[in-house]
From Swiss-Prot:
Component of the EKC/KEOPS complex that is required for the formation of a threonylcarbamoyl group on adenosine at position 37 (t(6)A37) in tRNAs that read codons beginning with adenine. The complex is probably involved in the transfer of the threonylcarbamoyl moiety of threonylcarbamoyl-AMP (TC-AMP) to the N6 group of A37. Osgep likely plays a direct catalytic role in this reaction, but requires other protein(s) of the complex to fulfill this activity. It is found in: Cytoplasm; Nucleus. The gene is osgep. This is Probable tRNA N6-adenosine threonylcarbamoyltransferase. One of its GO terms (biological process) is tRNA threonylcarbamoyladenosine modification. Pfam families: TsaD (PF00814). Substrate binds at residues 130-134, 162, 177, 181, 266. One of its GO terms (cellular component) is cytoplasm.
């Protein structure tokens, strides 16, 4: 039963998790939170990760009640993600691997989400909707690859929500998307917004540009409230995601759908997806914020699967890449 530690830091969350044979032993994380109306810059985010890495590592070991010599493999996020934060965490992982004299594995961030979702929910072979601040993909497994059947052609859905939260000067604590979700619950009026679906692909830049331009006018004229705008944005973008996911399920003949990624925590998205799934006689699988949001355990779990099949990354190849597509990885651990 190998024990694997995973280091995640592709965006504003630093997480270190430990997995042993499918059991999460520890999974602490720390989030870099900026003032309302601001995003997070790569350099500042990397500095945050550097400052908190030792503390989070110590917490992970203490909570798991294990020692460095009990670890069999070190795993880190190779990509995709923001360059500076990725590198900052990779340096920590490489250093730990050399100090502890352990093998190291570079893990695809998206595959970490998928494998964690499968582990926690028990989903067997689902169509996967991966939605976060940096990614929006509809995925299914086929012939040793996680195939991308549909994706955003511009910005990610989480990026769309986060940027609109800045327009409204919403707090980034715990996350802008969460605060939009809470405001949307109070919205009563649905504002018509651009709806762009192209086959199984989606586009969010147009809807964001439109609502950014119209927000001041609509709010100053009291045609609607900020809550109405949050409600309208959520309903529109989530309807787009449900439509494309259903199309992929029909194409693959799937009776399971799994939502992963930070936006997957959204209860309204889960609710809308569940309605669609039940109408198709399918089942929805979703996780809570412990595992939907970026965390170290998901990197450990994907790395554990890879380690079991003999995958190890030579130290000189433990680089990072901001662009690392899901379908680039050969999935050796699945039939």
């Amino acid at each position: 039963m190998p024990t694997v530690i995973g280091f995640e830091g592709s965006a504003n969350k630093l997480g270190i998790g430990i997995i042993r044979d499918g059991v999460v032993l520890s999974n602490p994380r720390h989030t870099y939170i900026t003032p309302p109306g601001q995003g997070f810059m790569p350099r500042d985010t990397a500095k945050h990760h550097q400052e908190h890495a030792i503390d989070i590592l110590r917490r992970a070991l203490d909570e798991a009640q294990i020692r460095p010599q009990d670890i069999d493999c070190i795993c880190y996020t190779k990509g995709p993600g923001m360059g500076a934060p990725l590198v900052a965490v990779a340096v920590v992982a490489r250093t730990v691997a050399q100090l502890w004299k352990k093998p190291i594995i570079g893990v695809n961030h998206c595959i970490g989400h998928i494998e964690m979702g499968r582990l926690i929910t028990g989903a067997n072979n689902p169509t996967v909707l991966y939605v976060s601040g940096g990614n929006t993909q509809v995925i299914a497994y086929l012939q040793k690859r996680y195939r991308i059947f549909g994706e955003t052609i511009d910005i990610a859905v989480g990026n769309c929500l986060d940027r609109f939260a800045r327009v409204l000067k919403l707090s980034n604590d715990p996350s802008p998307g969460y605060n939009i979700e809470q405001m949307a619950k109070k919205g009563k009026k649905l504002i018509e917004l651009p709806y762009t679906v192209k086959g199984m692909d989606v586009s969010f830049s147009g809807i964001l540009s439109y609502i950014e331009c119209m927000a001041h006018k609509l709010l100053s004229s009291e045609e609607c409230t900020p809550e109405d705008l949050c409600f309208s944005l959520q309903e529109t973008v989530f309807a787009m995601l449900v439509e494309t996911t259903e199309r992929a399920m029909a194409h693959c003949g799937s009776n399971e759908v799994l939502i992963v990624g930070g936006v997957g925590c959204n209860k309204r998205l889960q609710e809308m997806m569940d309605v669609m799934a039940k109408e198709r006689g399918a089942k929805l699988y979703a996780t809570d914020e412990r595992f939907c949001i970026d965390n170290g355990a998901m990197i450990a779990q994907a790395g554990w699967e890879m380690f079991q099949t003999g995958s190890v990354t030579p130290l000189e190849q433990t680089t990072c890449t901001q662009r690392f597509r899901t379908d680039e990885v050969e999935v050796t651990w699945r039939d």
